C-alpha cells in the first residue's frame, strides 16, 4: 500500500553474485589481498566474512578475530571475542558453521561444500535506488543514516529463512566494511548436520 492508501504491485529485479575461490584466505594479511572497493564490494565483504568463519578453532581463534576486525574496520573487543568463541563452540559449530553458507553444503552431507569453493549472495529485496535501507520506500520509511547502509543476503540450506549483514562504503578509502556488529548475525544457530559430530 502506498502513501495514498492504494495497493501497488512493485516489480523488483534481484541481482545475485557468485564468488568462486581458487585459494582461501586463512588470515588477515591474505584477506587484505582482495579488493573490496569495487562496485560489488558489499557482497564480496560478506563472502570474505563467511570464509573468515572457517578459520576459527579453539586453539587458534586469533586469525578469525583479526579477519573480522579488518572487515569491520575496527578492533574486536574482548566482549565480542567471547561472543564469537561461545557461538563457535556451541554444538561444535566451528566445525561446520563457515562451510554451511557455501554452495553445495547441506545438513545431509555434513555441510561439505562443492569444489571449487563458491558462495552465492543476493541483493536486498527492498525497492529503491541502490537498495540502501536509508532511502525512501513507498511502504517503509526508515531513519536516515550516514553513511548509507546496505544489506547483503544469503539463502542457504542451513536455514529456512535468509540471513544478511549490513555494509557501508567508507567515504575516504572507498572500501566496503561491515556495519557495526552485524557480522555476528550469521552466527545464529542453523540446522544440525546429519552426523559425525559430538554434541
Task: For every predicted segment, state its role.
Residues 57, 73-74, 113-131, 181-199:
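Contiguous hydrophobic segments
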Residues 7, 155-198:
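Short beta-strand edge/turn micro-motifs at domain boundaries
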Residues 6-106:
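Core segments of small alpha/beta cavity-forming domains
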Residues 80-158:
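Surface-exposed, charged secondary-structure patches
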Residues 1:
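Flexible glycine-rich surface loops and low-complexity tracts that mediate binding to linear polymers
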Amino acid at each position: 500500500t502506498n502513501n495514498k492508501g492504494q495497493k501497488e504491485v512493485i516489480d523488483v529485479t534481484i541481482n545475485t553474485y557468485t564468488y568462486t575461490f581458487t585459494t582461501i584466505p586463512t588470515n588477515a594479511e591474505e584477506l587484505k589481498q582482495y579488493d573490496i572497493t569495487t562496485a560489488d564490494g558489499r557482497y564480496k565483504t560478506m563472502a570474505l566474512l563467511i570464509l573468515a568463519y572457517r578459520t576459527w578453532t579453539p586453539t587458534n581463534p586469533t586469525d578469525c578475530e583479526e579477519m573480522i576486525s579488518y572487515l569491520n574496520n575496527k578492533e574486536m573487543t574482548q566482549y565480542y571475542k567471547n561472543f564469537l568463541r561461545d557461538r563457535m563452540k556451541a554444538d561444535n559449530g566451528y566445525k561446520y558453521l563457515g562451510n554451511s553458507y557455501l554452495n553445495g553444503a547441506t545438513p545431509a552431507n555434513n555441510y561439505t561444500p562443492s569444489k571449487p569453493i563458491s558462495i552465492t549472495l543476493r541483493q536486498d529485496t527492498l525497492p529503491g535506488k541502490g537498495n540502501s535501507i536509508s532511502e525512501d520506500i513507498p511502504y517503509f520509511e526508515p531513519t536516515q543514516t550516514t553513511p548509507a547502509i546496505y544489506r547483503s543476503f544469503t539463502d542457504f540450506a542451513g536455514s529456512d529463512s535468509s540471513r544478511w549483514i549490513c555494509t557501508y562504503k567508507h567515504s575516504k578509502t572507498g572500501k566496503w566494511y561491515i556495519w557495526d556488529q552485524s557480522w555476528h548475525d550469521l552466527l545464529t544457530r542453523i540446522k544440525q548436520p546429519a552426523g559425525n559430530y559430538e554434541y
